[in-house]
Amino acid sequence: MSDADVDAESNPYLRDPPTEFEPAESLSREAAEGQAALLREAVREHDHRYYVAADPLVSDAAYDALFSRLVALEDAFDLDTTNSPTNRVGGEPIDALETVEHVAPMLSIDQSTDADDLREFDERVRREVGAVDYVCEPKFDGLSVEVVYEDGEFVRAATRGDGRRGDDVSAQVKTIPTVPLSLRGDHPDRLAVRGEIYMPKSDFSDLNARRVEAGEDAFANPRNAAAGTLRNLDPSVVADRPLAVFFYDILDASARPDSQWAALDRLREWGLRVTDRIERAEDVAEAIDYRDRMQAARDDLDYEIDGTVIKVDSRDARERLGEKSRSVRWAFAYKFPARHEVTTVRDIVVQVGRTGRLTPVAILDPVDVGGVTVSRATLHNPDERAALGVAVGDRVRVKRAGDVIPQVVEVTEDGGGCYEFPDECPVCGSAVDRDGPLAFCSGGLSCPAQREASIGHFAVKGAMDIDGLGEERVAQLVDAGLVETVADLYDLTADDLAELEGWGETSAENLVAAVENAKHPSLDSFLVGLSIPEVGEATARGLAREFGSIEAFPIEADAEEDEFDAFEERLTTVPDVGETVARRVRDFFENADNRAVIRALLDRGVDPEPVESGGDELDGLTFVVTGTLAASRSDVTELVESHGGNVTGSVSGNTDYLVVGENPGRSKRDDAEANDVPTLAETEFEALLAERGVAYPPE
């Protein structure tokens, strides 16, 4: 018997179920499979009633008895438990989170705290598609995920990531009670939905109390707790923490409802949890009123929200409005203003970032700001601090920018103190360099603060991608004296690591292997890993294309001034590298300690792959892509750039072609029309590349 054959109405484990059973071993396999199928159906129904409908049918004790019986049957007869509710207790730890492509793009939403911006959004919508109704929803302050079902069964879950790709967190999400492993009712064959994973505020307080009692650090806020939990590699840890989810959008389905309101009804019918704080609005005034009422009620909710989302209800109108490259044009997030509280400044310290940037930070009397205890707040930069006039002893108004980052807004009462920004780095004593309003430590990688932060950054995805080397482990390696610079990572042995607290033979060997596997990065990834100021992934790709190999950079110990002059001049020819960025990159390479670290990496066998140009077949051509293509956006960019072309994010008079894939955004097409830029369907794009000897899609 399969679970699908079970008739819920005749299931004996739904109402007044037995709590005692004969030994599992006394059943035949056929009888055990039949009873297990009934129990799975019953446990799923009880989960739905308890977590989603808030209308339980049985007592906790009865539920526990049914659950235990199901576990006993599955264990005794080695039954298939792929999507059994018993899987929620968590499985074996995994080595790392893998990146997966989303079924459909998870685009962002334009946002503002200003009602006039919402009114402008409404005017544009009505101008383009006429009168519409809106659906108003809370803007949950959690972690957005895509959950995929096939034939009604849970298949996969992934974080939002960059909107196109995210981390596979299937093992973690399966443990969350409010995520059904099997859909209810007349569900579509294929379904991808979007939801927000969060930690209830009441459970967050209890979790933090337990962590403090156990000698562990408390989480800063429920969102951090949810995000940290979901990315934990051990599903049993996730299962032990109180995560929950609200679903609010259908990303892809074999049959899609014709409105958002209908989509929410379908989600409920399929057993997917939807908040009851959703309303319709006939005009923008009603949407503003909804937001004001939600702001007044936010403290009474058991989940964090930071605003409301206003969505065009009609799917037809949505399709006509289209999308931008990163956000939809049919929804708007009307956010709450940041919360403010007044407290006293007890000290001002200077924080040193991984690129050497010095940031003044106010140490405060602890104050509760929106449910989070704030004891530190950024002052941004020396000029901002001076403009605010903040000094020790002042009473200041503090807010959480975006309800996340604490910052000082103003001085409300002068405490009579004074403060001067240091002219030396507080960590290493090197001179402070000023660049406009910003201040930087000139010590480079010889500065311990920059060194430790740069080691952690060296290992991240997009740089050297060293699995298992997070911030805590980096701090442990530095504290133990095993690592002073990133080059020292390549001297580590399993014996060194196995002696450290919390390490075993397997984890030590895994890290050594991961470091060894990171000896042949692409040149742009290597440059990202060096923590060069102003150099992110896009700029690193440009530098890699321009210079071709690491040896083309001035990295020798005896590099002279004229070499750096020529280097800086060449930098300004790289797309999107202006004079300021060129100067910051020059400063990095002009620092002898930084060059020594690069040479030490090369001496230890790190060999960044030279950029081998695929030719100049696309030289001088600039493309913009909208919609979904057969190849990922990053693969298209890499292909075009390797053959001398350029891919940008927006259409202008300098664009040669707009490549249009599936579900394209309207704004780029409008911009292309306004600038007389030709558009290419994907097949036409493929033909154009083929004419120039470039194969597409890339292998």
Swiss-Prot record:
Job of this protein: DNA ligase that catalyzes the formation of phosphodiester linkages between 5'-phosphoryl and 3'-hydroxyl groups in double-stranded DNA using NAD as a coenzyme and as the energy source for the reaction. It is essential for DNA replication and repair of damaged DNA.
Organism domain of life: Archaea
EC nos: 6.5.1.2
Catalytic center residues: K139
Disruption phenotype: Deletion of both ligA and ligN is lethal.
The keyword Acetylation is assigned to this record: no
Name the record gives this protein: DNA ligase
Binding site for NAD(+): D60, A61, A62, Y63, D64, S108, I109, E137, R160, E196, K311, K335
Gene Ontology biological process terms, A to Z: DNA repair; DNA replication
Binding site residues for Zn(2+): C425, C428, C441, C447
Catalytic activity: NAD(+) + (deoxyribonucleotide)n-3'-hydroxyl + 5'-phospho-(deoxyribonucleotide)m = (deoxyribonucleotide)n+m + AMP + beta-nicotinamide D-nucleotide
Effect recorded for K139A: Lack of activity
Family note: Belongs to the NAD-dependent DNA ligase family. LigA subfamily.
UniProtKB keywords: DNA damage, DNA repair, DNA replication, Ligase, Magnesium, Manganese, Metal-binding, NAD, Zinc
Cofactors, names only: Mg(2+); Mn(2+)
Listed InterPro entries: BRCT_dom (IPR001357), BRCT_dom_sf (IPR036420), DisA/LigA_HHH (IPR041663), DNA_ligase (IPR001679), DNA_ligase_AS (IPR018239), DNA_ligase_CS (IPR033136), DNAligase_adenylation (IPR013839), DNAligase_N (IPR013840)
Single GO MF descriptor: metal ion binding
BRCT domain location: 613-666
Lineage: Archaea, Methanobacteriati, Methanobacteriota, Stenosarchaea group, Halobacteria
Activity regulation remarks: Displays maximal in vitro activity at high salt levels.
UniProt region (Disordered), positions on chain: 1-29
GO CC term, one of those recorded: cytosol
Pfam families xref list: BRCT, DNA_ligase_aden, DNA_ligase_OB, HHH_2, HHH_5
DNA damage in keyword set: yes
